[in-house]
Amino acid sequence: MNTRLKKTLAAVAALVAIGLTGASFWFWFTPVGLNNYINKITVQSLLRSPESLTSLGLLDDTLLDFHGDKLTPFTREEELASIAFMRKAREGLNRYGPQGLEGQERLTWAIAAWMMDDQIAQARFERGGYRLTQLDGVTVQLPQFLTDVHPIRSHRGAQRYLKRLEAFGDILQQAHQRVGEDRDHGVLPPDFIVRRVLEQLRAFVAAEPAQHVLVTSLQDRLKAVDSVSATQAAELSRQAQAILEQRVLPGYRQLIALHEALLKQTDSRAGIERIPQGREIYAAALASHTTTGLSAEDIHSLGLREVERLKAEMVDILDAQGIGRRSQPLAQRIAELNRQPGQIFPNTDAGRAAMIAHLQAIHERVMRAAPRHFKTVPPHPLEIVRVPEYQQDGSPGGYYNGPALDGSRPGRFYINLKDTADNPRWTLASFMIHEGAPGHHFQAAAALSITGVPLMRQMANFTAYAEGWALYAERMAKTDMGLYEGDPLGDLGRLQAEMFRAARLVVDTGLHAKGWSREQAIQYMIEHTGMPAAEIEREVERYVVSPGQATAYKVGQLAILDMRREAEAELGTRFDAREFHEVVLMNGGMPLDLLRDNVRRWVKQHP
């Protein structure tokens, strides 16, 4: 285990222990200095969330495990308590700055203030979206938490699982009440979203109780616990099945009935403006996700310009490679490219292994070049693995999970290999660079390497920063690293990936600010990206239930590129891209305006 990470993990455990035991009066009541105050708020926030404490994996099955049999209530009272906590924390932050702070402390204060202000701003809306969707909500999050996160390393851990299973039944009742209240206040999801939710709810209750994942996952994990006998394991499984049948499945059936009623009451309008305060909710979502003051109109216009620029570059490559005719729609020319020999790996075990080997070769080439372009090359290894087969139906084409805080797990790029045709050879280089190095893997590993700052700085997640960096990395791999030299089709893959994010700017704002329909959004995305219709349908339905989130990627990339151009103009021949990357990465995630201030400060201080 990395020594610094080991110390960080020990520090987190110690902070939580202090909070649980009340061992430090000064920690709770009069923290000395900003960093101690931020750590106090971070720990208090963790203590409010049993799921977060379990996810950290620090205290479960220890003497300080007070949380391992609990779940956070899904009630308005719990929401109000969380809002009150955040408002009090924000008031307290003003006692520590920003006056008199310099360097990292001033940056820490600004990041913390932005995060707290954003949460308070979102809390203005009691009904700011849809509580249950195909991607989010307790019916998505809690089954995954119970089966994948809750630890079962002892008989006690299994008993606590049963307690949480009972609590899940209570939360389903709370969800039923809250979705019904939302409906009564005019908050109804579009009909196509209700159908997706119904599909998932019905699939959840379809299995026989004895074969249900909430029972079988317990059985599977108990097999690895030597201290639990076969008799004890059988009894624990029996109890889990009983709770499932008596508490959980009835809750799901109530939600099914409620959503069947919703389906008769709703319509197909896609945008968030369909609900009360929808325009204000969308403006707040854009501010939160992009971390800027850009309006929906600004973002829509930006997207249209980027789509036209990228389309022209893609057409030039297709023309040069003799793929299709200029008069053909882009989607048809992309389909013709995919039919070329060698572009699709065989959909066999051997073909899947060959695809992973190809991705590994791309990663190794990037890592050989990285020291010439980065002062700090993260030491954390990266693994390339397939999405588990049982998850691949509902999983995206690929995604990245960062290294463990304690260094026990490497960064991992998961690629969905259900159908190798989903990822043609010409798209793989940009995909690997975005999710791996120097994209998300460098950015996530850099955050773990920051020293002398509160834990919040290592844990902070800003979509515009993280996704903006990954898109910047795709372009930098071409302009700085030369990774697409002699590979025009690989460069086409990079442009298609960027086009996908640019089209999102148009579609997200079209849906939520311009009255676009689901079908209009799907047609626009297919026309301009050439991606498969089924994949685009899933994407558009994601934008419908997560307003604003999809705009952060391209906004972030363009902001970082603009910061670089500004620094190059100021410094001229003194500009060093390695130093620029160090400034952007080695302070961790932050809002884009703060990142720009950081870059300008670096330029001003540059010799």
Across the structure, where does each feature detected by a protein language model lie?
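Short, Lys/Arg-rich N-terminal segment immediately upstream of the first membrane anchor
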Residues: 1-6, 419
